[in-house]
């Protein structure tokens, strides 16, 4: 038995050793293997982090950026606003023979556009929207304010807020020089009746009818 063991040891000592040229190759292969393992662990870690982020976003609340109320689009409300603006223009035209005492009233398209924007802006926070508006139209003339008309947007609804639009006459720029071109004579009166043109700027005064909050005044 001892002879066999000695013989076995002798045979192992006599076996050819691994060439030294293979050692660097094995070390290189081992380093590549470690790099692959490290890369695999990094990918798994990123995948776990992404998965945990998805899980937390699914289980938790969804973050929604702040959006102001004026940024919401309501087609029905916008269509109603266009109708109200047209009604305002019609009432102003009818007022030329009454409180305004003029032969012609020129209403700039830009003024109507600004009024429409202000109507949407001031009614967006109201419980009934623009339908709950009671609109007073006034025109500043000769140092005083003349009431031209009052419009209940929905006459079957109790108004929730009152909106007073104080319009101004255009007395600047080219208009005073060409105003006479629009002046006419009424058959009922030989006196010359002047033509008026509204300015694009106006004042909006809002008062809530269901609250004791202070008046909101905006220069537009």
Curated annotation (Swiss-Prot):
KW Flavoprotein (keyword) present: no
Gene Ontology terms describing biological process: apoptotic process; dorsal/ventral pattern formation; negative regulation of TOR signaling; response to hypoxia
Entry annotated with the keyword Cytoplasm: yes
InterPro entries: RTP801-like, RTP801-like_C_sf
Keywords: Apoptosis, Cytoplasm, Mitochondrion
Region annotation Disordered: where it falls in the sequence: 1-62
Regions of compositional bias (Low complexity) in chain numbering: 7-22
Primary localization: cytoplasm
Domain of life per record: Eukaryota
GO cellular component: cytoplasm; mitochondrion
Protein name stated in the entry: DNA damage-inducible transcript 4 protein
Gene: ddit4
């Amino acid at each position: 038995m001892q002879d066999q063991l000695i013989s076995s040891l002798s045979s192992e000592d006599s076996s050819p050793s691994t060439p030294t040229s293979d050692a660097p190759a094995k070390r290189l292969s081992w380093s590549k293997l470690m790099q692959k393992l490290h890369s695999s662990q990094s990918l798994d870690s990123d995948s776990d982090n992404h998965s945990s982020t998805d899980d937390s976003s699914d289980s938790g609340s969804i973050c929604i950026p702040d959006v102001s109320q004026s940024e919401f689009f309501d087609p029905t409300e916008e269509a109603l606003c266009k109708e109200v603006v047209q009604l305002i223009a019609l009432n102003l035209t009818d007022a030329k023979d009454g409180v305004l005492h003029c032969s012609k009233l020129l209403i700039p398209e830009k003024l109507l556009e600004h009024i429409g924007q202000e109507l949407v802006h001031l009614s967006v926070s109201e419980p009934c929207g623009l339908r709950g508006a009671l609109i007073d139209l006034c025109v500043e003339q000769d140092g005083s304010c003349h009431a031209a008309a009052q419009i209940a947007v929905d006459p079957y609804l109790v108004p929730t807020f009152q909106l007073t639009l104080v319009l101004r006459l255009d007395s600047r720029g080219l208009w005073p020089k060409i105003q006479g071109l629009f002046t006419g004579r009424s058959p009922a009166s030989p006196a010359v009746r002047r033509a008026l043109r509204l300015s694009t700027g106006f004042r909006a005064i809002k008062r809530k009818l269901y609250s004791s909050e202070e008046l909101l005044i905006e220069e537009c």
